[in-house]
Amino acid sequence: MLKKLIFFILIFKFTFVSAQLNQEPRNITKKFFSELNELENITPALKKKKGFTNYQELLNYIDEKVQNYPELVSSNFIGESQKGKKIPILHISKNSNYDIKKLRVWMQGGLHGNEPASTESLLYLIHLILEDPDYKYLLDKIDLVILPMANIDGFLKNDRYAANGLDLNRDHTKIMAPETRASKKAFAEFDPHIALDFHEYRPFRKDFAQLSSFGISNPYDVMFLHTGNLNVPENIRVIIDTLFVKNAKKSLDKLNLRHRHYIKSEKYKGEIHFSTGSNTARSSSNFYALNNGIATLFEIRGVGIGKTSFKRRINSGLAVGFSF
């Protein structure tokens, strides 16, 4: 199993420079993760050279869409973060009341605060659905709810965790954090058919430094983590994998973006073990699927590399989002 997984992982030489936030050398980026530059600089983070979308920029961006498209977009706040920041959510629909004949689609990002392309992908997706004629047909078929920055406190300090140190993607059963309670209430009220959770992952892991002569990096632009919980009906598990995720992979192939099912590494008795998938109801992909929804979490290659390949990462998120 280990040999098979390592075969699919691209081996890279890399130099550790502790003072730098970006762990990836430029020559590696240029050769293997070149930027996809066709995206316009229209979202807050793309408009500036440094930093990511901050809270006020997020609110301004949402307000602009509501003002420009009042017949399609509405927004409200589902609750507050632990530090008192109101959590915005968007409803995009051609109908003031949801049409029972349409699919209800839930998309969320920023559940981990150090995964900025998850939020930026959703902001760009909002722009395309509202302003690009190629995507407007979707609103004849779906009603869409977007929670772009679920963990505002963590996002503003580029930290995975909420203000109390809790991982919000391990809180779907205990529901200890106010952010979780707010999102769960909004999710239940919307009752989506399809739920998609945008994330990013760290390509350079501490365990990887012990593999090969120089360490390795995970090369996949996107990894998919859909439910492995056996309490989810088999037909739902099968259709997620063989229809929805399969279509997403085809969309990524068109952009020459690499993908695979999610893998993680961990130490066990001094050895590095790789595992795939997840079955715990604490995480979103399983919790949402246990509500009889078509649910997938996907991870974009991006944590720990700053703004490197940022448009490539956003393109990855858009490809998966629109494929669903």
Q: What does each model-found stretch correspond to?
A:
Residues V17-F324:
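M14 metallocarboxypeptidase catalytic domain recognition
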Residues K4-K13:
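Sec-dependent N-terminal signal peptides
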